[in-house]
Design a protein with these regions (language model features):
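Active-site neighborhoods of divalent-metal-dependent phosphate/nucleic-acid chemistry enzymes
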Residues: 54-60, 68-113
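Alpha-helix capping/helix-boundary segments
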Residues: 9-10, 40, 80, 99, ...
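Generic structural signal for small/hydrophobic residues in well-ordered secondary structure
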Residues: 7-8, 44, 84, 103
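Phosphate- and divalent-cation-binding pockets in alpha/beta enzyme and binding domains
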Residues: 43, 83-86, 119-120
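Short, well-structured N-terminal submotif of metal-dependent ribonuclease cores
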Residues: 1-36, 52-64, 106, 115-119
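Short alpha-helical
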Residues: 19, 42, 79
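Active-site regions of enzymes building and remodeling cell-envelope glycoconjugates
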Residues: 121-126
């Protein structure tokens, strides 16, 4: 199975691992196909710049940590971007909508504690 960390799960991995569920901790520690979207890096950078996120790590640092833990970084392709148009307007967060579309396009399971994401036709775990 292929897993895509959403932004909150990514932040927990590197700042508060005890906040991850037991299942999410097993996924992160395991030898599995684990990825993060570049969308999460955009979200973190934007929220840091407007003062909505206090996460004392630069994006290049975060990228290095991900790669050091064999977490692949996925770019966002036009197919996933196009897929957003077909998503129902359940979730108002554009970053989460991009992650949902990417997971659907790549046939991945999203690791998330977000309560709204599972309302979409996408696989999730927490």
């Amino acid at each position: 199975m292929r897993y895509l960390l959403d932004t909150n799960a990514l932040l927990y991995v590197f700042s508060a691992p005890s906040e991850l569920s037991a299942r999410a901790q097993r996924i992160v520690r395991g030898e599995i196909d684990l990825s993060v979207s570049v969308v999460s890096f955009w979200e973190i950078a934007i929220k840091q710049s407007i003062g909505k996120l206090h996460f004392n790590m630069t994006i290049p640092n975060l990228e290095s940590l991900c790669l050091g833990r064999n977490i692949q970084i996925l770019g966002l392709g036009s197919t996933a971007i196009e897929r957003i148009k077909a998503l129902p307007p359940i979730h108002g967060d554009p970053f989460d909508r991009l992650i949902i579309a990417q997971a659907q396009t790549e046939d991945m399971t999203i690791v998330t504690c977000d309560k709204v994401i599972p309302q979409y036709p996408v696989k999730t775990v927490w």
